[in-house]
Amino acid sequence: MKNIIVTGGAGFIGSNFVHYVINNHPDIHVTVLDKLTYAGNRENLSGLPEDRFELVVGDIADAELVDKLVSKTDAVVHYAAESHNDNSLKDPYPFLHTNIIGTYALIEACRKYDVRYHHVSTDEVYGDLPLREDLPGKGEGVGEKFTAETPYNPSSPYSSTKAGSDLLVKAWVRSFGLKATISNCSNNYGPYQHIEKFIPRQITNILSGITPKLYGEGKNVRDWIHTEDHSSAVWTILTKGRIGETYLIGADGEEDNKTVIELILELMGKDKNAYEHVNDRA
């Protein structure tokens, strides 16, 4: 494998993967295909060697462009997605266009040219798990964990389109022999993350003198994983994974939102209770 395409490679998680590949695998040339929406940024790719990397600005739903690029590559790693839950409730169409139609264009091209395909997805396709205190036996903290056998139960236009794209890939593997793998990862944090996301939003608010807001009681639990660990896992799946398999990526880093906000405040030299409780979002 000498050439790979990384869709969404100018976004948060995708750009971290591009840096990971360039830094750790000197024989690989990376082509980034990115629409450069508000979540994508050329600066995320600054400093990369020009002979190892190319940025193509375009839409993954552009079948002609995708066909041209895929015909010249050895593998596609598909990160590109509309991923903001709140935005999906306001206008679902971009999520259908990118997450469903875009995925279709990519897997069709990979099928046509017999190109290896890895599909990066999210644990949000599984919906919400109950906290331990809501399960028989009581107690506090994390309850069940997702497994590869957990049924899909998406709860928003975003997560439903990601679930739909996962199922498209599974169908193309079974129906057409697509050489594909899927990974569903938990919440990422790390460099280049957009300020709309939970951790950078709290940090930015504190730096700006704005009191961080905690929705509800802050009991929502997320498993947090650093993007470097996620990138390493995706590369391992791409190069060693079994075709047709789905891999769950996590870090056993479960923390509730309240704990995360308090930790950020303490690390930034503030009173850990210097946040504001607001009504939970519907």
Could you tell me what each predicted segment is?
Residues 37, 194, 198, 256:
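Short acidic-hydrophobic sequence patches enriched in Asp/Glu that either
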Residues 109, 172-175, 191, 205, ...:
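Histidine kinase transmitter module recognition
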Residues 4, 17, 30, 58-61, ...:
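C-terminal substrate-binding subdomain of Rossmann-fold SDR/epimerase-dehydratase oxidoreductases
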Residues 129-130, 191-193, 197:
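Short beta-loop-alpha junction of Rossmann-like oxidoreductase domains
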Residues 1-188:
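N-terminal Rossmann-like NAD(P)+-binding domain of SDR-like oxidoreductases, especially those catalyzing
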Residues 164, 168, 172, 202, ...:
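Hydrophobic alpha-helix immediately C-terminal to the catalytic Tyr-X-X-X-Lys motif of short-chain
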Residues 42, 67, 89, 195-196, ...:
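Conserved strand-to-helix beginnings and helix N-cap segments that scaffold or border functional pockets
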